[in-house]
């Protein structure tokens, strides 16, 4: 027995071309395929990429190649860790001078200790038996 005629004669919906889709450009697996090196560099620089030139060079050399994704992964691994975590930021005090290395190490050590004490106090378990709004709500819910 064969396949029904309706299945054989009708193309799938994704293959049917409508007047709107006939004029569209066909999708490309590599969006950088026809781009110039300067265009790719500008794209990465505008996005704030620190390695814009290096990344653009790799993509341009590998345009149309399956190695583009792997090259981008390698660059991502090379990226240094971000140093803008709030616990690492140090704001100098108005009266202190940065020229004295001994003073700056003492300030850093004391600020690290105060930062650690804040973290541990924030994680301390709460005593739900104490009178107050949180204890009262906890008793109602449980």
From Swiss-Prot:
Residues 74-88 have a biased composition (Basic residues). The keyword Cell cycle applies. Induction: By vasopressin. One of its GO terms (biological process) is positive regulation of MAPK cascade. Residues 1-28, 74-142 are annotated as: Disordered. Residues 15-28, 96-119 have a biased composition (Polar residues). Keywords: Cell cycle. May be involved in MAP kinase activation, epithelial sodium channel (ENaC) down-regulation and cell cycling. This is Arginine vasopressin-induced protein 1. The gene is Avpi1.
